[in-house]
C-alpha cells in the first residue's frame, strides 16, 4: 500500500457547527495523520484561484461565495491510500445521497454547504497541498 498525502478542507458550515474535533477524530480513526493544518478566512481571490478548475461551471460563483462566508480549517493528511480513505470518510457530494456515518451525512446540510472538500486524485492532491502549504509547512511524522 502506498503512503499518500491529500488535502482536506473543513468548510465554513462545519466550522460554524463546531465539529472540527469530531471530523479530526474520524481522520485519525481511519489511520490518517494530520501533517499540516491551519484555520483561515479565504479571500475571494484565494477561493477563485483554488477552485479555478470549476470557473466555467454554473455553480462557481456560489461556491466561491460560500467558501469566503466564514473561516475554514485546512489540513494535509497522510497515510496509506489517504486520498481514497478521505473520500470514503467524506461520503457523496450530496449529503442526502451520502451513506450514514459519513462526514457529509452527519454534518452537511446541502450539496452546497457540504461540510468538507477532499482531493480527488494524486495529481490534484499534490497541487492542492502545495497551494495551501508551500515549502516547509508539511511535516511527516
Swiss-Prot record:
GO cellular component, one term: cytoplasm
Reaction equation(s) it catalyzes: a 2'-deoxyribonucleoside 5'-diphosphate + ATP = a 2'-deoxyribonucleoside 5'-triphosphate + ADP; a ribonucleoside 5'-diphosphate + ATP = a ribonucleoside 5'-triphosphate + ADP
Binding locations of ATP: 11, 59, 87, 93, 104, 114
UniProt cofactor(s): Mg(2+)
Pfam families: NDK
Main subcellular localisation: cytoplasm
Cellular localisation: Cytoplasm
Keywords: ATP-binding, Cytoplasm, Kinase, Magnesium, Metal-binding, Nucleotide metabolism, Nucleotide-binding, Phosphoprotein, Transferase
Keyword match ATP-binding: yes
Assembly description: Homotetramer.
Protein name as annotated: Nucleoside diphosphate kinase
Gene: ndk
Amino acid at each position: 500500500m502506498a503512503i499518500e498525502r491529500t488535502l482536506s478542507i473543513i468548510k465554513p458550515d462545519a466550522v460554524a457547527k463546531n465539529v472540527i474535533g469530531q471530523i479530526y477524530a474520524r481522520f485519525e480513526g481511519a489511520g490518517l495523520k494530520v501533517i499540516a493544518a491551519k484555520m483561515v478566512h479565504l479571500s475571494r481571490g484565494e477561493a477563485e484561484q483554488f477552485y479555478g478548475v470549476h470557473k466555467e461551471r454554473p455553480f462557481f460563483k456560489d461556491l466561491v461565495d460560500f467558501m469566503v462566508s466564514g473561516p475554514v480549517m485546512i489540513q494535509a493528511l497522510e497515510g496509506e491510500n489517504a486520498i481514497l480513505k478521505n473520500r470514503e470518510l467524506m461520503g457523496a457530494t450530496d449529503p442526502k445521497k451520502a451513506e450514514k456515518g459519513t462526514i457529509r451525512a452527519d454534518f452537511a446540510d446541502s450539496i452546497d454547504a457540504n461540510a468538507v472538500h477532499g482531493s480527488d486524485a494524486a495529481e490534484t492532491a499534490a497541487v492542492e497541498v502545495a497551494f495551501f502549504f508551500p515549502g516547509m509547512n508539511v511535516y511527516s511524522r
